[in-house]
Every structure is written in C-alpha cells, then in structure tokens.
C-alpha cells in the first residue's frame, strides 16, 4: 500500500517524469485517519509514490502514527539531504525497510561530489549496524542498461562499498550475470533493476490486453488524498476518489475499481493509462 506523505523532492531525476500536481504534504490528522482505515487492508505502508520522506522535518510524527496503528513502513529516499539528525529517526520501530535510490545521484546535475553524496549514507548505514538494525537496507541500482555513463557510475559505487564494507563486487560480473540483488552485510543489499518509462496518457498504446498487480497487491494514495490504482499513477490520471471526502472501503467498492479489477483478471485493460503502460508488461 503506497501512501505519498509528500510529493516534494529536492532533486529532479532524469528517470522521473515532470510533476504536474501542486506541491503538497499530507496533514498528520488526515494521515492518522488513513492509517486507521488501512488497518483493514494491509499491514505495511510504503511512504512513496513520488516525493522524498526525508525532506520532512516531522517525519518521526508520521512514523509514530503508523506504529500506533501497528503498520510497518517502507521508506524510499534519494538521501540527498541525509545527515546525523536523521539517524535516530530512521531507527524507528515502525520501519521495515529503507530503500536508498543510489542511482539518483547519476541522474542529476549535482554541485555535490560523489563522496559528498555517498559518505553520509554510508555513515548512516554504519550507525544502523552499530544499533543492530532489524529492518532491511537496500541500495537501489536501477540503471542496468548498456550506457557507459551508468556502468562507470556503478563501478564507482561498487568500489566504494568494497572498501567500506569489505566486499568484492565486480561491475563486469554484475552486468554479465544480472543478479536481482547482492548481499553486502546482514540485512543490507544491493537491489538491481533497469530504467523504465513511467506510464502517461501522452504515450502510445502498448496493449489493450494484459494484467497488473494494481488494485490487487497494492494501490496508492497521493498527498492530496486522491486514490489511484497503482504506484505509478503519480498524477492521478485514474482518479478513483479522494480520502478527504470518501472512505477507502467505499472507494475500493466503486464500479470503476471493480471494472479495473475484473479486467485484470480477464486479461482486459479498461483504463487508457494501463493501455499505455510499458511497466505492466512485466506481469504478462
């Protein structure tokens, strides 16, 4: 279950589409109400559609609310602004997993050097290890294409990790074997994937048939309360309703939601955005 507590991010990654929605952050009161409702649907939240939770100075209060409702949390962040003030917050009991989008550095024009970016992240990981963290830490390298720039960047990342964590990761072996993940230390992994194109109504139709995990394994709630069928509908092109005016159970019982779900079960894509989504082809 993806809940976007803010759509604010302090980077403009080339792999993210332009944000069309106004800047917004979900209020703590509304977030509390959504967590209360979501207990009937999930045990786990991902604080992400777009936006970076670490930009919020009161992130701990959101985590407190999820913990109160016995919900575990996945955090995805570029960690561009991570510093020691985040260390204790990111040891919160609600957290199940932290994903660091490491290849975000290579997808931006930075004033920071690579070491200025990566060193504070490594500092946090070592702090978490000293605290015997029980959650998973993933370094996402989602750029395993064949471009030289990405491969050279990845080589630099691996060399840094090899030195800091006594590993022996070879960039050529990674590109040759294409592993899904590599263990760095206890509950600390590299996670690999390739770039993908975000779905857009401006795209060409990919297919009118197929299936998806949207509205099955997950759905999304944007920071303004709009409910969407999946974690890639950042602009609510498929606006299923709004949690500011409707209960989640009523939104999920709507005719439109049922039509989408039944379509996926019968290999039919009813929504235009789904027909224009390349990522969905992974599930065919």
Which functions belong to the PLM regions below?
Residues 35-39, 86-107, 155-184:
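Structural recognition of alpha->loop->beta junctions
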Residues 9, 13-16, 212, 230-231, ...:
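Short cysteine clusters
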Residues 1-98, 109-119:
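Conserved alpha-helical substructure of the radical SAM core
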Residues 107, 126-157:
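Conserved strand-turn element in the central/C-terminal portion of the radical SAM core barrel
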Residues 124, 128-136, 166-207, 232-282:
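C-terminal accessory region of radical SAM enzymes
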Residues 221-222:
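Short, acidic, Ser/Thr-enriched surface-loop or helix-capping motifs
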Residues 215-217:
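Short loop/turn microsegments at loop-to-beta-strand junctions
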């Amino acid at each position: 279950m993806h809940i976007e507590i803010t759509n604010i991010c302090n980077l403009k990654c080339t792999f993210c589409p332009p944000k069309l929605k106004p800047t917004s952050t979900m209020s703590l009161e509304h977030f509390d109400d959504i967590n209360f409702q979501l207990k009937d649907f999930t045990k786990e939240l991902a604080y992400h559609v777009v936006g970076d939770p670490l930009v919020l100075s009161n992130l701990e209060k959101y985590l407190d609310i999820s913990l109160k409702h016995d919900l575990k949390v996945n955090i995805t962040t570029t960690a561009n602004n991570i510093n020691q003030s985040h260390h204790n917050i990111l040891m919160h009991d609600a957290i199940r997993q932290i994903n660091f989008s490491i290849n975000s550095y290579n997808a931006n024009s930075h004033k920071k050097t690579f070491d200025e970016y990566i060193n504070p992240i490594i500092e946090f990981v070592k702090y978490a290890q000293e605290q015997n963290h029980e959650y998973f830490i993933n370094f996402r390298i989602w750029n395993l294409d064949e471009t030289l720039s990405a491969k050279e960047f990845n080589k630099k990342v691996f060399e840094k990790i090899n030195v800091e964590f006594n590993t022996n990761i070879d960039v050529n072996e990674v590109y040759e074997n294409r592993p899904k993940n590599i263990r760095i230390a206890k509950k600390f992994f590299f996670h690999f994937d390739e770039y993908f194109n975000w779905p857009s109504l401006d795209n060409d139709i990919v297919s009118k048939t197929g299936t998806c995990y949207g509205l099955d394994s997950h759905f999304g709630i944007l920071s303004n309360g709009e409910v969407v069928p999946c974690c890639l509908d950042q602009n609510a092109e498929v606006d299923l309703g709004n949690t500011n005016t409707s209960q989640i159970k009523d939104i999920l019982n709507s005719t439109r939601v049922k039509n989408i779900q039944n379509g996926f079960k019968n290999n039919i894509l009813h929504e235009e955005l789904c027909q224009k989504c390349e990522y969905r082809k992974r599930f065919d």
